[in-house]
Amino acid sequence: METRTLEDWRALLEAEKTLDSGVYNKHDLLIVRGQGARVWDAEGNEYIDCVGGYGVANLGHGNPEVVEAVKRQAETLMAMPQTLPTPMRGEFYRTLTAILPPELNRVFPVNSGTEANEAALKFARAHTGRKKFVAAMRGFSGRTMGSLSVTWEPKYREPFLPLVEPVEFIPYNDVEALKRAVDEETAAVILEPVQGEGGVRPATPEFLRAAREITQEKGALLILDEIQTGMGRTGKRFAFEHFGIVPDILTLAKALGGGVPLGAAVMREEVARSMPKGGHGTTFGGNPLAMAAGVAAIRYLERTRLWERAAELGPWFMEKLRAIPSPKIREVRGMGLMVGLELKEKAAPYIARLEKEHRVLALQAGPTVIRFLPPLVIEKEDLERVVEAVRAVLA
């Protein structure tokens, strides 16, 4: 195994910063390994990871079953287009659909969340023959041109106008606005069961149930974006289970591959059949390597029932955060281990202090919200340390 000196690591950090496109604001540290809910930088500092790869690491960093599955598959076959069937693709389809409602029985595999949403939008237009989409204010579906079109945040959208049209944005959790927006021209309504980038805002049961009823009445499709909420994050396998509904298309990614890039649009058979042959495609989507990772990730999730851990630890964690006696806190909200701490001021300085002073990694969800997306394998003692770190920086 190659051994690197600290000088080597620093040179690589400098290379990333200087040769990168510059789109991202880089932290001043180099993460070199991870295990479970911990990561380590090049200088040996240990961090509690509540970023979790933006929700990728539900099963923990370096999950041994995913690692072993990837090793085995890499030795056998890594790439093969979807026109040529492979055993692992069939295994993934069978494994994924087995944990979903029977209505969701057709899979279009991709590499990422934004690709899953792009596919969903195209399938919706193909199925309905309509053009219009309805999305929510503060909603986030991705940054490629189609998914960006149903992402609300103006700073993401405005530099790239014109986008896919027409799209109508409504206030999240506003049933009356939803009724007014969905009409006979609407192809689909696309919603997150919990808005992530928009501030960790859960949907009300009334809103999502109304979305299901209204789309059915108007002949439109309901797309649920569970890129971040899927794979146990909210205390159920999938967040839609909290609401007693089934969408027409479910989009998944992030934790689906256990750390390997993998996404999917899962849909009803009649929706899948509406897309003409060759109407959509992907070179790497459904590759055997990602399929093997996905199978291992789902099987690990099912055996360990990690969603039950999220259902137990999430409310406890939120109550501990609510008990912090700080006038800077406006609200604590979330679902399972998808938690947002909203402040009355900018969140960025406090996130930086959590990292530098307490070795806790967290992320923003809008200007004033600290978002926590720890691996679902995190120990309660680590969450207690996170609470104490938050208490210290907000003192």
Swiss-Prot record:
HAMAP family: LysJ_aminotrans_3. GO terms for cellular component: cytoplasm. Its EC number is 2.6.1.118. It comes from Thermus thermophilus (strain ATCC 27634 / DSM 579 / HB8). It is found in: Cytoplasm. This is [LysW]-aminoadipate semialdehyde transaminase. Keywords: Amino-acid biosynthesis, Aminotransferase, Cytoplasm, Lysine biosynthesis, Pyridoxal phosphate, Transferase. It catalyses: [amino-group carrier protein]-C-terminal-gamma-(L-lysyl)-L-glutamate + 2-oxoglutarate = [amino-group carrier protein]-C-terminal-N-(1-carboxy-5-oxopentan-1-yl)-L-glutamine + L-glutamate. GO terms for biological process: arginine metabolic process; lysine biosynthetic process via aminoadipic acid. Binds 1 pyridoxal phosphate per subunit. One of its GO terms (molecular function) is pyridoxal phosphate binding. Belongs to the class-III pyridoxal-phosphate-dependent aminotransferase family. LysJ subfamily. Its main location: cytoplasm. Pyridoxal 5'-phosphate binds at residues 113-114, 140, 225-228, 283.
